[in-house]
Amino acid sequence: MMVIRPVERGDLAGLMQLAGKTGGGLTSLPADEKTLSSRIDRALQTWQGTLPKSEQGYVFVLEESDTGTVVGICAIEVAVGLNDPWYNYRVGTLVHASKELNVYNALPTLFLSNDHTGSSELCTLFLDPDWRKEGNGYLLSKSRFMFMAAFRDRFNEKVVAEMRGVIDETGYSPFWESLGERFFSMEFSRADYLCGTGQKAFIAELMPKHPIYTDFLSPQAQAVIGQVHPQTAPARAVLEKEGFRYHNYVDIFDGGPTLECDVDRVRAIRKSRLVTVAEGQPAPGEWPACLVANEQYDQFRAMLIHTNPTCERLVLTAAQLDVLKCNAGDTVRLVRLCPEEKTA
């Protein structure tokens, strides 16, 4: 069975293997053992309650419970930008006009922004390509909403997610090539690695301080502003169906979109509800896939089951209860995995 659980120190080797499969561009999952080890430690300290809010971050792994193999990772930062500035570009407009000459130009412009300071962030989502099947990607992404719903007071009012921008298989980023490289004088992969390993001071030191007219960028760079990497398109669609929207903020490195939503308006959080579990054989029938999660902070578990999403009493097998760290009579959180498609 596939189960989501908190990261553990013993997961380091598995995370290093995952990091080696990302192909670059996933800043928060560098193939660097020291960085990943520190990330695990920070997550454990977050659960232990020893870190200030500005440093808190939860990390979860997707595990195949029979073998203990780690096949995916996802994370939540509690509040971004409270220690180091959290940058993105806001895509706006500057108007240049002259009535006398009958000239009016509305020019798209990039403004450096820290507008999302203090927001919670969904990040570090990666699933081993060999395991991209049977709803694993949905489980990995949406399990975080179950955790946020159960422990709502630990997160802020808004949640954001930076989507991976357009980068080709060689690591070439049109946006970086046309803009970032001119200010940072390094390749995209180098800047990405420095950022991922916590060496972020160079951003504040070298960032352009004034608005950038996008017309000055290459046509290729202009075309990818707010666009996602082809492999990231499904993840964007998943979040948009949960209520996330693009409000004209993009990543400073690759131009990928930042999606955002009020936490309490996220569908899976808003519609999740508590039910009592019982042990037995689930009723037969063609039931939809649902997310189920326990309500245990330190021993959080989440998995997919097929059941009636409106049931008042959830029947699980002994094996499912064991994986969820639950007993009959316990309370669990339940929500339909995907929103129902509206029919005309």
Swiss-Prot record:
InterPro entries: Acyl_CoA_acyltransferase, Arg_succinylTrfase_AstA/AruG, Arginine_N-succinylTrfase. Succinyl-CoA binds at residue 125. It comes from the Bacteria. One of its GO terms (molecular function) is arginine N-succinyltransferase activity. It catalyses: succinyl-CoA + L-arginine = N(2)-succinyl-L-arginine + CoA + H(+). Keywords: Acyltransferase, Arginine metabolism, Transferase. Pathway: Amino-acid degradation; L-arginine degradation via AST pathway; L-glutamate and succinate from L-arginine: step 1/5. The keyword Acyltransferase applies. It holds the Pfam family AstA. The active site is at residue 229. The keyword Acyltransferase applies. GO terms for biological process: arginine catabolic process to glutamate; arginine catabolic process to succinate. Its EC number is 2.3.1.109. Catalyzes the transfer of succinyl-CoA to arginine to produce N(2)-succinylarginine. Belongs to the arginine N-succinyltransferase family. HAMAP family: AstA. This is Arginine N-succinyltransferase. The gene is astA.
